[in-house]
Amino acid sequence: MSSLLNYKNSGVNIETGNNFINIIKNITKSEHIGGFSGVYECKNGTKLVASTDGVGSKLELCNILDKYDTIGIDLVAMCVNDIICQGATPLFFLDYYAMGKLNLDIASKIITGINEGCKQSNCLLLGGETAEMPITYKNDKHFDLAGFSVGIIENEIYPKQITENDLLFGLKSTGIHSNG
């Protein structure tokens, strides 16, 4: 059974994704592409870290369960987790919510979750974009959700310095998380 639970069998081709990252690197001539987040060094030496992500197929669970109040928390976590693993402290977050028809009940539950995720992450919900696209999305329950987070590095983490026998902490899951 476990051999069936992998990216390839779910229709995702990791090799093609990696090839696309190489295409992006070629086009942009950037060696900073390919990690979970990007680091930008300002002229004064301050380092900002940015990440964008989505909640992936967890949107399907929202629709099946008719539960939309926690997906925003997941969205913030997906983005913020990608910057904190670089040693960044989250500063702010922006969201992108696209749907066929704006349903105020669903939308307010989603934004409540995003706001809660920002509170839990100690970052500001700075803004976002709401896009009604009835030609692209079938109805109010057919939508996509993405986010963008920015943080600042105060204490750098050097992954190459991590070695065997270093202490690793595991945290208990709060439930089913997103796959991005």
Task: Give the positions of each predicted feature.
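Helix-biased detector of long, well-ordered alpha-helical tracts
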Residues: M1-G180
